[in-house]
Structure formats: C-alpha cells, structure tokens
Amino acid sequence: MEVILLERIGRLGQMGDTVKVKDGYARNFLLPQGKALRANEANKKKFEGQRAQLEAQNLERKNEAQAVADKLNGESFIVVRSAGETGQLYGSVSTRDIAEIITANGFTLHRNQVELNHPIKTIGLHEVSVSLHPEVQVKVMVNIARSTEEAERQAKGEDLTSIEAIYGIEEQPLSEEVFDDEDEAEDQA
C-alpha cells in the first residue's frame, strides 16, 4: 500500500514522502497513529493544503523534545534488581522498566521511545538511547544494581562482579606449586 508520510519515520522517509509499505503496517500502525495518509489524489491535495501547518506542528514538537533532551541527556537512573553473585539478573530489565524509571523521575516517556536491542540481563552501567522525536535522540545511563549502595559503588567505577567484590578476597593467580602438587599426587596414584 502506498502512503504519504505526515512526519519523519526512521528507516522509511521524511514528511511528505510517498512510500510503499506492507498493508498490515499501514493499517495497524501508520494510519491509526496519524503518521500517514493513504496515497490517493484526494489525500495528496489535502496534504499539500496542510503541509505548512504540519511542518509548523512538527517543528514545535521537535523544539519541545529538544528542551526535554537537554535536561535528560547524560542523566543516570538507578534500577534495583535481584541478581546472583556473578552479576546475572534474576529476570531482565526491559524497555518498559527503563521507561517507568525515567517517568518516575519526572519525565514523560513511553516504552516505545526507549531503544534497546535486547533486554539487559547483567548488573552494571548500561548506556541506553532514548528517541524523544524522530530527529531528537539522547543517551542516558542506566545503573543496574542489587541495592542503592551497590549502585553508588558502581557509579564510582568499581567492578562488582570480580571475586574481590563478591567474596572480599583478592584474586590471585594459582602458583606453580599447586600444579606441581597435583602432578605428584597423580604420579603416586
């Protein structure tokens, strides 16, 4: 199905472009969300008549998104989750979790604006991209930890998945004596 885009859509086109998309994508997403019109003569004339107004609305939304981006860019958010000793989470942190944390801190954000290739499954500092507008993207830091104290330690740069951090002992390489003792025990057996 051919549609006329009413706003910029990533990997598809700019406002005013006539593009061919799959019928389901147009019917279930683009048309109901008001992001496109069916490409017929009546809609083309309607779009050309409203083009200046649509461009002004798009510029206004972009400026609002840029104002939020200036506040949000580089911010760090703490997510507390249960995890094993090695740093593997019991579960994962998804786009919904990140959007809820950011929203709880006073920003308006939907989960589809958080760009995450796959759920986060380990503790640590993770950089996440947030798309506030098709032309405005920011990076935020998500600090996933077992507790707020641990999150503060991670923020300072401490590695909490090392043996020293887990057990409180220094990680030391095995000396050759250990291997020699094992070899002697095997020879005697």
From Swiss-Prot:
Q: Which Pfam families match?
A: Ribosomal_L9_C, Ribosomal_L9_N
Q: Which family does it belong to?
A: Belongs to the bacterial ribosomal protein bL9 family.
Give any GO molecular function from the UniProt entry.
structural constituent of ribosome
- InterPro entries referenced in this protein's UniProt entry, alphabetically: Ribosomal_bL9, Ribosomal_bL9/RNase_H1_N, Ribosomal_bL9_bac/chp, Ribosomal_bL9_C, Ribosomal_bL9_C_sf, Ribosomal_bL9_N, Ribosomal_bL9_N_sf
NCBIfam families reported in the protein's UniProt record:
L9
User: What GO terms in the biological process aspect are recorded for it?
Assistant: translation
* GO cellular component labels: ribonucleoprotein complex; ribosome
At the top level, the lineage of the source is Bacteria
Q: Which PROSITE patterns match?
A: RIBOSOMAL_L9
Functionally, this protein is described as follows: Binds to the 23S rRNA.
Annotated protein name in UniProt: Large ribosomal subunit protein bL9
Q: Which UniProt keywords apply?
A: Ribonucleoprotein, Ribosomal protein, RNA-binding, rRNA-binding
